[in-house]
Amino acid sequence: VLFRSLIMWLFGWLGRRGKVISTPKKIAIGMGVAGVAYLFMTLFSLGEGYPSGTEFRDMTAAGADVVKAGWWVLILYYFFMTVAELFISPLGLSFVSKVAPKNMQGLCQGLWLGATAVGNLLLWVGPLIYNNYPIWVAWAVFFGVCIISMGAMLAMLKWLERVTA
């Protein structure tokens, strides 16, 4: 709730200064912020030399304790992911209702939420990667997906802004 209030305040503050950020641009920024979270996890895991999930399970308890991340890593990661989610999810649903034809708004909103469900179904890719490779590889793949998604939004930005104007 705190982050939502801060971000809404930021949008209002920018709007009062004539620097309104379009919804498609906010979604692209959200993907970039998620990318920052995954880049942080990639670099941190790489720097710490974290093993794959399979290698971690085979370690002794003493060895496993050495390669566990501190609480601050999770807090920083979740901070970025929460901010990214605030840029993407509610704005995406609002954007869909703006651009969908009146007689198809419900269907289009359902498709937006369905896309989220499909994304959740693809979560098996993470364990597939991190059980066979050092965990930084999984974070790097997620980083790449975020950057590609952000790039796709930015590539369509002018068209999307024209459609919503």
Q: Model-flagged regions — what are they?
A:
Residues 13-32:
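Cytoplasmic membrane-interface "Motif A"-like loop-to-helix N-cap segments
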Residues 29, 136-158:
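Symmetry-related core transmembrane helices of the 12-TM Major Facilitator Superfamily/SLC fold
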Residues 32, 79, 110-114, 118, ...:
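Transmembrane alpha-helical cores of Major Facilitator Superfamily
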Residues 36-43, 117-129:
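A gly/Pro-rich, aromatic-decorated transmembrane alpha-helix motif that marks the paired
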Residues 72, 102-111:
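Loop-to-transmembrane helix entry/capping segments in MFS-fold secondary transporters
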Residues 86-100:
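Intracellular juxtamembrane helix-capping segments at the cytosolic ends
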